[in-house]
């Protein structure tokens, strides 16, 4: 700005100033030639030649990459699981003996597309490849033996009575809040992951069972021990204490792929037929009308404990051929499951589900069943799954709801 103003006011002085600046630059270049002055090398070349400088730069923290939202276009790595059993949505409420007659949806895997190396058949993801040439190869006979060996390895030596009481005491409601809730869907596949997460921080976890699965607690205990390789050390009504085992290592827990959604249940044969076997149409109608008029044996509460329902029905069949159970307020699929379980456990014949009632018939040639046999797989103990009177009754009575009659 100063030079511009000077050139406007006095152009002669501006020319003199430029000549002086030019003479100074010439003199400085002459001094450089006279004294052999050399400028220092640039910083970039010294940094590349100095190894200590490069090492310091490498030790610096690398910048964090920018966040990229997940996209369905990116490939997902397929998960492999070595668990020796078929993956189902519910292990306690699904029966592998009854074959479905149809599917309500295409065979989309609930684990997600290409996320699991097992094929989804519409009902389960079998541990062995279902596409085999021979019929004998559909089910691997060594799976049960493999599960038994894995469980024995994890459990180690059996617990003493003092150790069992100590674990039960630690799992009371006044001691810990760790609990796994088991509802109308029973033992689901994702619930296995919840059990293993609790086993990271504690040796045992409390399992609270309510609703339809409590009708057959032996089935619940069997599948809990079979699928988690644990041990049920206490049972008080619908409250169980599941122990992880002496040799359990949380760092070596099995890989459990999670289900992303609940698959639709397949279509099974009808529970109530048009006519009851051995009776005519008129006799069937008369029996259904008579069954709805019979006094109710009990009224089931929603999300209650139904563990004493089977012996109640067996005792009622000693004096009456028809039994009615009031299920008012329960969902239709719930009391249908109750009827299906009673048919297999009592055993009996289903008559009707009308008016939210479960009416069952003992049959023509009824014989009182014998005492229940224990499951032949993993439940070999006599007293470990019984209720602990001193601990569970005093501290766990408030933890289990009473049955509404």
From Swiss-Prot:
Q: Does the keyword Repeat apply?
A: yes
Region annotation (Disordered) maps to 32-75, 384-405
Q: Which UniProt keywords apply?
A: Mitochondrion, mRNA processing, mRNA splicing, Repeat, Ribonucleoprotein, RNA-binding, Transit peptide
Q: What residue range does the UniProt record give for the transit peptide?
A: 1-20
Q: Where in the cell is it found?
A: Mitochondrion
Give the PROSITE patterns listed for this entry.
CRM (PS51295)
Signal sequence region: none
Q: Where is the CRM domain?
A: 157-255, 277-373
GO biological process per UniProt: embryo development ending in seed dormancy; Group II intron splicing; mitochondrial cytochrome c oxidase assembly; mitochondrial respiratory chain complex I assembly; mRNA processing
Residue spans making up a coiled coil are: none
Q: What is the protein's major site of localization? A: mitochondrion
Cellular component terms (Gene Ontology): mitochondrion; ribonucleoprotein complex
Stated role: May be involved in the splicing of group IIB introns in mitochondria.
Describe its partners and assembly state: Part of large ribonucleo-protein complexes that include group IIB introns.
Entry's PANTHER family?
A: CRS2-ASSOCIATED FACTOR 1, CHLOROPLASTIC, CRS2-ASSOCIATED FACTOR 1, MITOCHONDRIAL
Name the record gives this protein: CRS2-associated factor 1, mitochondrial
Which species expresses this protein natively? Arabidopsis thaliana
């Amino acid at each position: 700005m100063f030079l511009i103003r000077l050139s406007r006011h006095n152009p002669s002085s501006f020319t003199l100033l430029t000549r002086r600046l030019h003479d100074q630059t010439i003199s400085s270049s002459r001094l450089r030639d006279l004294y052999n002055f050399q400028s220092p090398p640039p910083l970039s070349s010294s940094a590349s030649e100095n190894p200590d400088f490069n090492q310091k730069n490498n030790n610096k923290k690398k910048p964090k990459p920018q966040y990229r939202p997940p996209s369905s276009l990116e490939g997902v790595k397929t998960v492999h699981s070595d668990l020796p059993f078929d993956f189902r949505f519910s292990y306690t409420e699904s029966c592998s003996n009854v074959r479905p007659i149809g599917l309500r949806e295409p065979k989309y895997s609930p684990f997600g597309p290409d996320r699991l190396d097992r094929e989804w058949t519409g009902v389960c993801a079998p541990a062995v490849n279902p596409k085999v040439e021979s019929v004998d190869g559909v089910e691997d006979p060594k799976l049960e033996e493999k599960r038994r060996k894995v469980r024995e390895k994890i459990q180690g030596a059996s617990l003493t009575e003092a150790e069992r009481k100590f674990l039960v005491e630690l799992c009371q409601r006044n001691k810990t809040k760790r609990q796994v809730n088991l509802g109308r869907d029973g033992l689901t596949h994702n619930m296995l992951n919840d059990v293993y997460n609790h086993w990271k921080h504690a040796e045992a976890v409390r399992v609270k069972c309510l609703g339809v699965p409590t009708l057959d607690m032996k089935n619940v205990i069997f599948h809990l021990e079979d699928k988690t390789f644990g041990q049920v050390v206490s049972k008080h009504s619908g409250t169980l204490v599941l122990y992880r085992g002496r040799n359990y290592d949380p760092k070596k827990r099995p890989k459990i792929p999670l289900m992303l959604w609940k698959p639709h249940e397949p279509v099974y044969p009808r529970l109530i037929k048009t006519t009851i076997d051995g009776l005519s149409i008129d006799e069937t109608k008369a029996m259904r009308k008579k069954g709805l008029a019979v006094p109710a044996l009990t009224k089931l509460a929603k999300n209650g404990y139904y563990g004493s329902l089977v012996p109640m029905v067996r005792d009622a069949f000693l004096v009456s051929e028809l039994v009615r159970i009031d299920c008012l307020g329960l969902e239709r699929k719930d009391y249908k499951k109750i009827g299906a379980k009673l048919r297999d456990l009592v055993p009996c014949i289903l008559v009707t589900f009308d008016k939210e009632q479960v009416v069952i018939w003992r049959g023509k040639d009824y014989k009182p069943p014998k005492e229940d046999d224990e499951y032949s797989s993993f439940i070999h103990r006599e007293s470990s799954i019984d209720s602990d009177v001193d601990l569970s009754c005093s501290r766990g009575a408030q933890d289990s709801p009473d049955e509404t009659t």
